[in-house]
Amino acid sequence: MFIDNVKLVLSSGNGGKGAVSFRREKHVPLGGPDGGDGGNGGDVYFICDNNTHTLAHFKGKKELKAQNGQPGLGRNKNGKRGESLELIVPQGTQVIDAQSGEVLLDMLVEGQKELFLKGGKGGLGNTHFKNSTNQRPDYAQSGVAGKTLSVRLELKLIADVGLVGFPNVGKSTLISVVSNARPEIANYEFTTLTPKLGMVEVDDYNSFVMADIPGIIEGASDGRGLGLEFLRHIERTSFLLFVLDPLRDMSLKEQFCILRKELEKFSSKLYTRNFGLMLSKSDSINLGEEFAQKMEDDYNELKAYLQSQNNPQSFFIKVSSLEKTGLKELKFMLLEEVKKIRNQNNL
């Protein structure tokens, strides 16, 4: 099950209580204090793991707590430290304060380990309180309480290329033929109900990650359809590929303008991201001469519009996933854009 948003109450462990104890030996009737310290409470850590792809393992868990420190013992034996709580999360997980909305942690790197909540310090045993005026202190410190915080874990998939389009335009088919992803494919809207990642291998030495998200509809940025819930997954994609469908009831230009508008309303950063355009189902030109002419007119209308906007796109290509035409060219075009962005990020 794909889960990308959970709420949790996290607590570090309480420090153990220091011991009040005195030496008990046969020939020492009034032995001095020998109370050990309480153990520190366990910490709470977040660990980034690429082998984990969802937050589903937190489903049904509302409160998670590290172990408390053990109390101190006699004979100057300290209590055992509480076991820390290590929370394994996928790459791209944000830890957000549930009240303020502040992003507290951003887990981006494989193996990244972050201390989130420090455990309470263990209390001192009565040994520490012996002095010249009090040789037998009968008190010790209580342990310090751990910390508690309500958080929201939010997963944003990290990919090089994000597919953007209306439902049932061919995004899932595309990612299934160019990558190792195997999404459900059917001829009805919202087949893709969860985001999918696929590795696209261009040749023996070059590859990139592609993300397919549920289709966006007009009003997605205002909460309509499934789009709003998953739009955040393309926030971390380096390059966007708009997938346009000649078989829809609206023109290619209308599709493009609505999709761009929804991205702009959701995030100004997404709106300014580099993008390419792909006309899917180009094999539908075989549906008849009249349709072929309409499709060509639509295509030329969008090209003219893009030209009037100073061609903001990196490329515009026709592809048929069914007939596998244009796929090789598309992969190399996308790789070129991904390489440009990677090089810029390394400067």
Curated annotation (Swiss-Prot):
Disulphide-bridged cysteine pairs: none
A cellular component term, taken from the record's GO annotations: cytoplasm
Domain Obg: 1-158
Keywords attached to this entry: Cytoplasm, GTP-binding, Hydrolase, Magnesium, Metal-binding, Nucleotide-binding
EC number annotated for this UniProt entry: 3.6.5.-
UniProt: GTP binding residues: 165-172, 190-194, 212-215, 280-283, 320-322
GO molecular function, one term: GTPase activity
Residue ranges of every copy of the OBG-type G domain listed in the record: 159-339
CDD domains: Obg
InterPro entries: G_OBG, GTP-bd, GTP-bd_Obg/CgtA, GTP1-OBG_CS, GTP1_OBG_dom, GTP1_OBG_dom_sf, OBG_GTPase, P-loop_NTPase
Cofactor annotation: Mg(2+)
Gene Ontology terms: biological process: ribosome biogenesis
Pfam families registered for this protein in UniProt: GTP1_OBG (PF01018), MMR_HSR1 (PF01926)
Coiled coil (UniProt feature): none
Compartments (UniProt record): Cytoplasm
Residue positions binding Mg(2+): 172, 192
Its biological purpose: An essential GTPase which binds GTP, GDP and possibly (p)ppGpp with moderate affinity, with high nucleotide exchange rates and a fairly low GTP hydrolysis rate. Plays a role in control of the cell cycle, stress response, ribosome biogenesis and in those bacteria that undergo differentiation, in morphogenesis control.
HAMAP family membership: GTPase_Obg (MF_01454)
Family: Belongs to the TRAFAC class OBG-HflX-like GTPase superfamily. OBG GTPase family.
Entry-linked NCBIfam families: Obg_CgtA, PRK12297.1, PRK12299.1
Assembly notes: Monomer.
Name of this protein: GTPase Obg
